[in-house]
Design a protein with these regions (language model features):
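Active-site-proximal loop/helix segments of hydrolase catalytic cores
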Residues: 1-61, 65-68, 75-76
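C-terminal regulatory/interaction regions
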Residues: 45-47, 63-64, 68-149
Length: 149
């Protein structure tokens, strides 16, 4: 599911017009608008639209969400929005949520690679190893300030 800048109204319309639930199932989703809260409501303080929550419930077991954003932090940014990330991870789990602007190790890029085979989506085996390796490397480094723009 490629969401682009999809907001909750679009998802509501899709949910209302789609009569075959099989067409709504997904296992890999790009978090719309860089993980802003607009997928759920107009304002981050608003309750989420039920259609957006229902759409998340259409995810297959083991589904992934990828945000084309910097790492989501607990702050007032929107996008990316911590509250939106929490909505996604409540459904798919924290380990299946990724940001393309993730931590770098020794200034190396951090690509996110999936294998799609026979209708199944899985994190690429080398990517799993790299993720574990990066996490260990980041944990072992001295804390340094990070600047985001």
């Amino acid at each position: 599911m490629l969401g682009g800048d999809t907001e909750w109204r679009v998802i509501q319309e899709i949910m209302n017009k789609t009569s075959n639930d099989d067409y709504l199932k997904w296992d890999l989703m790009e978090a719309p608008h860089h993980c802003s809260y607009k997928f759920f409501a107009d304002d981050r303080e608003d309750d989420p639209n039920q259609a957006s929550l229902d759409f998340l419930d259409k995810s297959e077991d083991g589904a992934f969400v990828v945000s084309s954003s910097k790492i989501v932090k607990k702050n007032s940014d929107n996008p990316p929005c911590q509250k939106a990330k929490n909505r996604y991870t409540d459904r798919i789990g924290k380990s299946n949520f990724f940001c393309t602007g993730g931590e770098k190790v020794d200034d190396a890029e951090n690509p996110i690679v999936f294998d799609i085979e026979d209708g199944e989506v899985a994190l690429h085996e080398d990517e799993k190893k790299e993720k574990e390796s990066r996490a260990a490397a980041i944990a072992s480094k001295d804390p340094k300030p990070h600047f985001y723009g």
